[in-house]
Amino acid sequence: MIGDTKSSKSGLISGALGLSKNDEVKLRQRAITALERVYASGIADQRADSLPYPVTKRVAIARALVSEPKILLLDEPAGGLGAQDIEWMNSLIHNLATQCSVILVEHHMDVVMSVCNRLYVLNFGEVISSGDVEKVSRDPAVVEAYLGVNN
């Protein structure tokens, strides 16, 4: 019974997921490791709804890392962050990219230009350019759509 955590060999979460105590310990260790990878190990026992927004971004990435992906898809990881947190996120993405492939969907062009080595630029659902950062940043279609005509 899920509510009977004192007499069972598994806790509420592990019981609901059908995990043994050993599996629960392994899963917790993977979660701790993922939090360490995003420099958030100190928040492991805190409620997610009590964390500042930039830290919740780290927790979201850590949740994805628990599954030990070969490809990590990050959807606007810098969205809603201030300049200092964006700088930190750039560093984190660089670090993660040494451990797995990263696909980044992002509108902050400074983030894109600093962390990507190959770009596919879409405008209204159409690929308007692809290639390395230098080539794409000079493409007139990209400049007009995203970087501004004055660049």
Model-predicted regions and their roles:
Residues 130-131:
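ABC ATPase "signature
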Residues 1, 8-43:
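Conserved ABC ATPase "signature" region
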Residues 112-114:
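A short, surface-exposed alpha-helical micro-motif characterized by mixed small hydrophobic
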